[in-house]
Amino acid sequence: MSTKEKLISHVMKEEPVGSRNKVTVVGVGMVGMASAISILLKDLCDELAMVDVMEDKLKGEVMDLQHGSLFLKTKIVGDKDYSVTANSKVVVVTAGARQQEGESRLNLVQRNVNIFKFIIPNIVKYSPNCILMVVSNPVDILTYVAWKLSGFPRNRVIGSGTNLDSARFRHLIGEKLHLHPSSCHAWIVGEHGDSSVPVWSGVNVAGVSLQGLNPQMGTEGDGENWKAIHKEVVDGAYEVIKLKGYTSWAIGMSVADLVESIIKNMHKVHPVSTLVQGMHGVKDEVFLSVPSVLGNSGLTDVIHMTLKAEEEKQLQKSAETLWGVQKELVL
């Protein structure tokens, strides 16, 4: 008899039970690992699968996480073969070429489209009913690419979008007002990145409109220069990349925030990238961030924002910028 047999008596033969809340992270780079640890520490899934083409790096990262299993409640698996991802509820795609210092997110695009042509069909093969969350940049265009390549309905393809931009915005407003970010209600919509749109008309604390107190807020004529906060949001990622070489922690926490809303069916509103054709005067088939409701079925509803004419114009300009790139893509 083995030690195990001497120690344990079987009462019944267990039937294999599939995972109920399996999450897959594709890509074990800085963003993938920050997303993985954030998901694990929030205890969101009963199984976390990780996949990457870099076999040694993947193996090392998975082992490193597995060595912390005592402190977690999640089974951790990893393989370069996508069969390891089978039957995932949510698949988070972070893989792709990394943004270089000074490189715009749009420059990355065709490099990452080619990577997606391999990744997306594999995800669909093993998790045909999953919710696909795209994090790789440029996120809005790659969410469109993932939607086209997957054949999924639009509610099951979501981009992490401006969830992080809005978090940065709320943090910086909070710093200026000496308040916690959760008490500063503010939204950034449109493109994740250089042409994002701050909705100054909606910024409020406890229902008090800040533009009501300072009608010039967010404009050139504002003596308090609130507009600089949006510039800081846009420049924030570039600044972090310049200082430490990449961004990871905040985007990882943002991803876990979105996964939580889906897995726990919270019906929480997030600014995430979705198909906005027909909204706010956008005519083309583009994905941009608008406040959207996330739950078990993915993205179930979109909130109709009341935008000022200038904000709507900026959103349309954002859409045109993205469409200009999208129509050149080879899918």
Swiss-Prot record:
What name appears for this protein in its UniProt entry? L-lactate dehydrogenase A chain
Gene that encodes it: ldha
Give residues annotated as binding substrate: R105, N137, R168, T247
Localization, per the record, is: Cytoplasm
Reported function: Interconverts simultaneously and stereospecifically pyruvate and lactate with concomitant interconversion of NADH and NAD(+).
Tell me how this protein assembles: Homotetramer.
Pfam families this protein is in?
Ldh_1_C, Ldh_1_N
Q: Which InterPro entries match?
A: L-lactate/malate_DH (IPR001557), L-lactate_DH (IPR011304), L-lactate_DH_AS (IPR018177), Lactate/malate_DH_C (IPR022383), Lactate/malate_DH_N (IPR001236), Lactate_DH/Glyco_Ohase_4_C (IPR015955), NAD(P)-bd_dom_sf (IPR036291)
**Any one Gene Ontology BP term:** lactate metabolic process
Keywords in alphabetical order, please: Cytoplasm, NAD, Oxidoreductase
Residues involved in NAD(+) binding: 29-57, 98, 137
Reactions catalysed: (S)-lactate + NAD(+) = pyruvate + NADH + H(+)
Top EC category: oxidoreductase
Q: Name one GO molecular function term.
A: L-lactate dehydrogenase activity
What the entry lists under SUPFAM superfamilies is as follows:
LDH C-terminal domain-like (SSF56327), NAD(P)-binding Rossmann-fold domains (SSF51735)
The UniProt entry's sequence similarity note says: Belongs to the LDH/MDH superfamily. LDH family.
Give an example GO cellular component term for this record.
cytoplasm
Please name the catalytic residues of this protein.
H192
What does the record give as EC number? 1.1.1.27
Q: Which organism is it from?
A: Dissostichus mawsoni (Antarctic cod)
